[in-house]
């Protein structure tokens, strides 16, 4: 999965997919009542990027729906996964469940079109704080009470705080999550970070009793760091330059071993050689 980083304006969806992304990451900010408000990152952000592009969240979802609904004039067949980077740092811990409920209702209405031929992409809810694990239950509860529990089949999870792998496993246990787990690891492209924790996450993914289904590394902008991440066995790389990742995947060393994921590749299934 080539994951376009910080896609917060509707026009950027086309831009990143046309560069080779089959997945995008979008920032979601919340207001003081835990309503998802804007697709917005703010400063500071990655080096070489504009940090301040934004859209009202529900409007962005409508644009995203068009980009992932077959038959729509804006449809991109290869855009198959969306990671919502949930900026829950502005919320109190006891608002996490409410944030999940409100997020689910926004998605149900504006992205899934109330279950009637909405967008088809798989969705990852990426949560920065382990203490906010109740967001997951709130999300599920809202979809169930609105009569669409089947949409949970399209939803996965990520705790993005680079916490100890054991602590992350524990948070999922408390959240009642078994499966659909992506594990991120990374740091802004302005700084360097080793691959030690990525290797631990990959080892957990490949063990018989691990909780992780997929591992992605961020933010990967250079050819060499792409090669290093692929050599470590990641399933996805988040990048500001999807064309760089696509180029490396075309190199003979990687062509035989990796391919770009399509809609038929289940993002919740651990890949077995």
UniProtKB/Swiss-Prot annotation:
Keyword terms of this UniProt record: Cytolysis, Dermonecrotic toxin, Disulfide bond, Glycoprotein, Hemolysis, Lipid degradation, Lipid metabolism, Lyase, Magnesium, Metal-binding, Secreted, Toxin
Protein residues bound to Mg(2+): 25, 27, 85
Compartment(s) where it occurs, according to its Swiss-Prot or TrEMBL record: Secreted
A GO molecular function held by the record: phosphoric diester hydrolase activity
Major localization class: secreted
Disulfide bonds: 45-51, 47-190
Name listed for the protein in its UniProt record: Dermonecrotic toxin LarSicTox-alphaIB1aiv
Organism of provenance: Loxosceles arizonica
């Amino acid at each position: 999965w080539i994951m376009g980083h910080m896609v917060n304006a509707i026009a950027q969806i086309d831009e990143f997919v046309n560069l080779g992304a089959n997945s995008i990451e979008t920032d979601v900010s919340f207001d003081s009542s835990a309503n998802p408000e804007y697709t917005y990152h703010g400063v500071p952000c990655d080096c070489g990027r504009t940090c301040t592009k934004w859209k009202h969240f529900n409007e962005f979802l409508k644009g995203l729906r068009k980009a992932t609904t077959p038959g729509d004039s804006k449809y991109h067949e290869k855009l198959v996964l969306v990671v919502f980077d949930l900026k829950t740092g502005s919320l109190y811990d006891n608002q996490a469940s409410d944030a999940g409920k409100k997020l689910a209702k926004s998605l149900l209405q504006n992205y899934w079109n109330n279950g009637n031929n909405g967008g088809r992409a798989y969705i990852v809810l990426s949560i920065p704080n382990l203490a906010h694990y109740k967001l997951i239950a709130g999300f599920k509860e809202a979809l169930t009470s609105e009569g669409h529990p089947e949409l949970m089949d399209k939803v996965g999870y990520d705790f993005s705080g680079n916490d100890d792998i054991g602590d992350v496993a524990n948070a999922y246990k408390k959240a009642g999550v078994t499966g659909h787990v992506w594990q991120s690891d990374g740091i802004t492209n302005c700084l360097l970070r080793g691959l030690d924790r990525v290797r631990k996450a990959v080892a957990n993914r490949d063990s018989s009793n691990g909780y992780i289904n997929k591992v992605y590394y961020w933010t990967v902008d250079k050819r060499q760091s792409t090669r290093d991440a692929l050599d470590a066995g990641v399933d996805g790389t988040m990048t500001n330059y999807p064309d760089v990742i696509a180029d490396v995947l075309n190199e003979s060393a990687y062509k035989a071993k990796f391919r770009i994921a399509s809609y038929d590749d289940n993002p919740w299934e651990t890949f077995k050689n």
